[in-house]
């Protein structure tokens, strides 16, 4: 049995784990990372953020080429080469994973391939694919094992006609028709992809609207845009039964009013969320508290066990790659004894959904702000009034700023439309620096740009937007 001594050992190499390892190396700590997959990067790099966004990009290019004539460009015989789409996706995934390997070497992080298990105090047991074990001596441990697809009883996947978000990334052909169960980020993104690739697509959502965690006006705009693109939305509906048919699947259910719903398609995508992955970690018998599957931590990501931290999808904060990365940095800086480490402000975590049109948001929705007792003022600017949006031919959507009347504090920003997932960063910076809506509106933005819509929405809080 080999013995190694580390300042910190991280279990999991996703965006939380590998970023934590890099920061540890930057601070001069001897760091190890344990990963059971053959490649580094976790769900985000291998089966999540990166491959899905690459497929979305391919779908966007395909759609743009179909509308080339709108820009005075004649293109004929445009065809989708789905096999090449998959090759491009795999190439980008591999490049990103290799990039993480390089960063581990650059920051002198030792990588162990295998499954990590806590052997407290101060040890991590690593078992490789052949069953060989070794023990790492470590002063601190960070659990960053991520999440897995949540199974739904009665809607078990088979990888053929009933698939999850992992399966649908590896399809050989585009299905003729697709039912998407769940209208969160994963559901609406894949609906956008496969609809643009030619699948007759229907989204079914239990709650009354698409992307139900977003501002209600954003949800309504997305449903309108989807309808325009031929994507059908069946909201406020609970699916109760799945049947296999000769050509695919049939799902049946009821709306909240008791109306029967039956939909048939070649394929069903079950996209109803993920659950923390803590299997085999050896948490039993420790002081680490687990509630509803999530590891409980304090503001610095510490568990109840001294020297053991947890970050990312295994803790009860939003399951977002960028949040996991920041949690990893907080954990490492805290265990390193940095005096300037600050807890994460969860009000300033951006949410991005890469459907078409894109959605980006940060902070409170209008409804939530009112519920919390704020005297709310709203500024809103449509992209239909943006010169740059007209140039792009992408005039759907708007920027909405929710502010507090007395102090002009920006409480939330909600964007649906072109480059929303990029624009939201400006809102995050403004809120982080405690900018008022007035100050944001007075900040000069270059013309013509999509970002001018943020400035105009901020001016709109005080009814001073110029171009509407």
PLM features per residue range, with description:
Residues 113, 298-299, 404-405:
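Short, acidic, Ser/Thr-enriched surface-loop or helix-capping motifs
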Residues 2-6, 22-174, 202, 207-211, ...:
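Glycine-rich flavin
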Residues 17, 187-188:
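N-terminal Rossmann-fold NAD(P) dinucleotide-binding loop
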Residues 9-11, 116, 136-146, 181, ...:
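Short hydrophobic core segments
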